[in-house]
Amino acid sequence: MSSVGANIKKMAGNTLVYGLGNIFNRAITFLLLPLYINMMTPVEFGALNLIYPFLALMNVVYMYGLDAGFMRFFIPEKDQKRRQEIFSVVYLSILVSTAIITAALFLAEAPLSSLLLGDDPATSVFALAFIILMLDGLSFMPVLYYRSIQKPLRYVSIIFSEVVINLGLNVLLVGFWGWGLKGVLGANISSSLIKLLVASPAIFKNLNFTWNTRIWKDLLKFGLPTVPAVLFAMVVALGDRFLIKYFFDQATVGIYSAGYKIGMIMALMVTAFRFAWHPFFLSLSDQENARETFAKILTLFVIVGSFVFLLVSLLAPPVLTMDFNGKAIITPEYADGLRSVPLIL
């Protein structure tokens, strides 16, 4: 087999494994959608879909570009001690900043919840979102470490543990106990804690409590300029919920979000490809046949993506609204949200 073929095979294998990991992670969205739709009103479901975009934006702030800087300097580095030094600087920096940012969020809880949710009763559980941010901030780098050393199976095991706990607790807290939004956030806290514990071997293996200011400056010099672009991209991708709330109401946010989550099937494929692509691209960029390999991979990606778009656009509305013994995945109350599926795809 040629080196180009071997590289494509490696990329395809990693994409498949990362795809499984992201399918596990994103599958909870689809598996829990009928539960949320049947157990939560559009107003409450709308509140959930305003809180999660806020979490996504804040995750960027919690990382402030160190994730991009880490991959830039860690992956090409061959010396193990140097790699541990890079990991230590990144994790210690995030550890301190996470404590500071989380404390600031708790102090600003009242105005933030009022700005995001208005007078909605969900403001009473808004502080739970800050705990999720803290745990995700502490677990992000260990998970990224396994991506950076191209250990997709380890990555999938971490995501699988998180998803199983999250799914089980959602069924218990929301489905059986009827805790609604509080149950969703409580399940997320528990699953984020499990993710941190399962990923913690990467911390113990690499963290040595040494500090190198020069490495830290290099990481920030590379990573910080990426933050505005990432934030603006996320605002474009997630800001629609806030515009809908502003021009309409929170119930409309919930109805729209039901269709949006179906459209996120395409994001499963794109995210799986992107997760495998970054380490693969950096490790292959200095090879002679890199351009040919990249061209073939991207062509295949476009073909598969076009097929997924057509399949989901045509089949999602009739299948998801189909009546199964008086039940449907998307109930009539939320059916109007399916109009957005092709646009989201």
Language model features: what each stretch is:
Residues 75-92, 255-345:
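Specific pore-lining/lateral-gate transmembrane helices of multi-pass inner-membrane transport
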Residues 123, 127, 156-204, 222:
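Hydrophobic alpha-helical transmembrane segments
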Residues 9-68, 98-106, 166-167, 224-250, ...:
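Signature of the first transmembrane helix
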Residues 29-44, 113-116, 234-265, 280-283, ...:
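Helix-terminus/linker motif at the lipid-water interface of multi-pass membrane proteins
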Residues 1-30, 82-88, 122, 153, ...:
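N-terminal membrane topogenesis motif
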Residues 103, 107, 118-141, 156-160, ...:
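Alpha-helical transmembrane segments of multi-pass membrane proteins
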Residues 1-7, 11, 181, 197-237, ...:
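Interhelical loop/hinge segments that connect adjacent transmembrane helices in multipass membrane
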Residues 2, 70, 141-148, 152, ...:
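C-terminal transmembrane helix end/exit motif
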